[in-house]
């Protein structure tokens, strides 16, 4: 009973914090509002740790039916809380990172008048994310799914006086509506064919629908899984539906750390893992997931190399790492995908918040305009270095364990995407070293006054990062131990399903496969140092950042090709331009057609035309009202004459 109460409190506390700070924004004292937000989220994180230990040590699954929600014929849906191993580990990632971000925001947003509103939105997002991962049915999950989308819109556009922030918020919201439409269709199809939205009922009948073919090679289950995955592609920024994530960096940096690195963007990976009971019976969709994940991780990493905005580089890095996670799901290694999800939450949040420290200190996003900050911000440098090495996958940091397991699983499956994963590991190291060298090393390109006053942020911004540093170090070791348990899927044995009882072949891979990810990471580090350390001497040639970005390109016969490639990468493979010409402009033309039909035809001959007829009739009628008695006498006499004439003529004929 105690653990059930704790489970409820984990979810309710962020909601209560959001309601208090949101509704009483102009009444409550700012200091009290901050205390409420921080204390409630910290308690939620503490309770999550208790629940995690209980689920881990005792193996207990908590299922609480709070209240009946939908009852329609045979469809019955309850509002419930379902906590198994998968939910408990997600609770840890969400609440701990959210707590750190809340505390960090007190310093980062200290000068912002809307800080209480900001904290309210952050708490509301945390509530919806916890609702999403603790649902026991697809409809409740969808409520959390849409809730985090709305909060993302509010937080990206938090600085609503900036036009770029407003456009980014709208872009994120609309892009996700495209994928969410497929997600809704998937849920509707589940309800129609399964007659239920509850996980237990749907998963237990998965095999039945896998044998129900609607096309030659496609079953009903294939269609359901494909629709669900398209929903995941939008939320988790996979190739084609990724365009919103880099623009989302227009929001405050704490938002980027919480929503667009550690939590919301991983919701798609969580959904695929949760629905492993469905996806395992749809091998064709699993193959599609593997391909999309592999292409995305390489695609996003290649773009990150040529970006100059520090937050956008990390955003594309996030997109790339999400590709790794989906690649793992595609080869049925759901446990390593969730493992990487958790480790990634810690070191990527650390990278974003460390980048926030740099931006806060120098008020600049372009890394080619920075440099020499290692002596000014040594703690931030250390944090950024730890996060980068974890991202690259250097032992003993957490990324070494989780990324290694994904690549091992991909290798075991025989998928060609293993090669993509290895190339991505090299590119990851290169763009990580690019940031470190251009931001912290070499001669500064900042204005003298800005560089002179650059310093470490306050303790309230630096101290919370200790938790993320600890997570970047120890989450890998702990996770590796949990996955090494002598059960299928290790720690997640009751949450995940593998048709062929997939188990991590921890001791059965060749040694070179185990060492290859870190080896290529080291190679990438060396390449990055050679490229960008050497480019520092060229950076005094011009003040234009675009030229600085090209300075590393050697002067040779292949320079034209390299410049072309760099332009393609810098312009993000022209996805925005392609969408603008193929989708946006045709829609604008269609709107002009609708405008013409609405204004020139419907309105002109409809309500406006009717109004003109009435006005004309009124104008004619008004002319009769002259005010002269002889006119009225004439009208009366004329009427009498006409009437008498009518009856006389009628009698004659």
Swiss-Prot record:
It is found in: Cell membrane. Keywords: Cell membrane, Membrane, NAD, Quinone, Translocase, Transmembrane, Transmembrane helix. It is an enzyme of class 7 (translocase). Disulfide bonds: none annotated. It holds the Pfam family Proton_antipo_N. It is a multi-pass membrane protein. GO terms for biological process: ATP synthesis coupled electron transport; electron transport coupled proton transport. It catalyses: a quinone + NADH + 5 H(+)(in) = a quinol + NAD(+) + 4 H(+)(out). Gene3D superfamilies: 1.20.5.2700. Its EC number is 7.1.1.-. One of its GO terms (cellular component) is plasma membrane. Belongs to the complex I subunit 5 family. NDH-1 shuttles electrons from NADH, via FMN and iron-sulfur (Fe-S) centers, to quinones in the respiratory chain. Couples the redox reaction to proton translocation (for every two electrons transferred, four hydrogen ions are translocated across the cytoplasmic membrane), and thus conserves the redox energy in a proton gradient. This is NADH-quinone oxidoreductase subunit L. The lineage of its organism: Bacteria, Pseudomonadati, Pseudomonadota, Alphaproteobacteria, Rickettsiales.
């Amino acid at each position: 009973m105690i653990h059930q109460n704790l489970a409820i409190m984990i979810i309710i506390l962020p909601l209560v914090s959001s309601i208090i700070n949101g509704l009483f924004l102009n009444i409550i004292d700012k200091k009290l509002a901050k205390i409420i937000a921080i204390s409630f989220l910290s308690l939620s994180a503490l309770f999550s740790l208790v629940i995690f230990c209980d689920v881990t040590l005792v193996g207990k699954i908590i299922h609480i039916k709070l209240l009946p929600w939908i009852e329609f014929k045979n469809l019955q849906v309850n509002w419930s809380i379902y906590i198994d191993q998968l939910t408990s580990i997600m609770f840890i990632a969400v609440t701990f990172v959210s707590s750190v971000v809340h505390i960090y925001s007190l310093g980062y947003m200290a000068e912002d008048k809307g800080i209480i509103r900001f904290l309210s939105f952050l708490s509301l997002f945390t509530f919806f994310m916890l609702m999403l991962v603790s649902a026991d049915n697809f409809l409740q999950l969808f409520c959390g799914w849409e809730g985090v989308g709305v909060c993302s819109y509010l937080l990206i556009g938090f600085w609503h006086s900036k036009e770029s922030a407003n456009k980014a918020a709208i872009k994120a919201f609309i892009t996700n509506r495209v994928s969410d439409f497929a997600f809704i269709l998937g849920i509707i199809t589940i309800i129609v064919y399964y007659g239920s939205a509850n996980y237990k009922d749907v998963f237990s009948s998965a095999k039945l629908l896998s044998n129900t073919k609607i096309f030659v090679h496609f079953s009903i289950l294939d269609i359901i899984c494909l629709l669900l995955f398209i929903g995941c592609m939008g939320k988790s920024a996979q190739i084609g539906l990724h365009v919103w994530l880099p623009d989302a960096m227009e929001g405050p940096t704490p938002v980027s750390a919480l929503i667009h690195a550690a939590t919301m963007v991983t919701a798609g990976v969580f959904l695929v893992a949760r629905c492993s009971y469905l996806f395992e019976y749809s091998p064709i969709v699993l193959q599609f997931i593997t391909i999309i994940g592999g292409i995305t991780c390489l695609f996003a990493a290649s773009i990150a190399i040529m970006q100059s905005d520090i937050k956008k580089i990390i955003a594309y890095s996030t997109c790339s790492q999400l590709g790794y996670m989906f690649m793992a799901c595609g080869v049925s290694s759901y446990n390593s995908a969730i493992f990487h999800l958790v480790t990634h939450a810690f070191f990527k949040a650390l990278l974003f918040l460390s980048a926030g420290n740099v931006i806060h200190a120098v008020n600049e996003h372009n890394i080619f305009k920075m440099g020499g900050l290692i002596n000014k911000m040594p703690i931030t440098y250390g944090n950024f270095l730890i996060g980068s090495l974890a991202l690259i996958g250097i032992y003993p940091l957490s990324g070494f364990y989780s990324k290694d397991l994904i690549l091992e699983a991909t290798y075991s499956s025989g998928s060609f995407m293993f090669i993509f994963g290895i190339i991505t590991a090299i590119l990851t190291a290169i763009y990580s070293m690019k940031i470190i060298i251009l931001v912290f090393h070499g001669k500064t390109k900042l204005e003298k006054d800005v560089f002179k006053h650059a310093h470490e942020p306050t303790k309230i911004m630096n101290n919370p990062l200790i938790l993320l540093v600890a997570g970047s170090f120890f989450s890998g070791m702990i996770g590796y131990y949990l996955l090494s348990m002598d059960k299928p899927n290790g720690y997640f044995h009751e949450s995940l399903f593998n048709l062929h009882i997939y188990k991590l072949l921890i001791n059965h891979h060749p040694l070179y496969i185990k060492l290859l990810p870190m080896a290529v990471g080291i190679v990438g580090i060396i390449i990055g140092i050679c490229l960008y350390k050497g480019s520092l001497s060229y950076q005094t040639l011009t003040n234009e950042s675009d030229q600085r970005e090209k300075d590393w390109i050697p002067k040779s016969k292949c320079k034209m090709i390299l410049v072309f490639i760099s332009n393609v990468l810098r312009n993000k493979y022209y996805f925005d331009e392609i969408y603008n010409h193929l989708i946006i402009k045709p829609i604008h033309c269609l709107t002009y057609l609708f405008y013409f039909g609405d204004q020139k035809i419907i309105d002109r001959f409809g309500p406006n035309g009717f109004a003109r007829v009435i006005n004309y009739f009124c104008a004619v009628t008004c002319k009769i009202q002259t005010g002269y008695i002889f006119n009225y006498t004439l009208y009366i006499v004329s009427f009498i004459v006409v009437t008498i004439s009518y009856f006389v003529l009628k009698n004659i004929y």
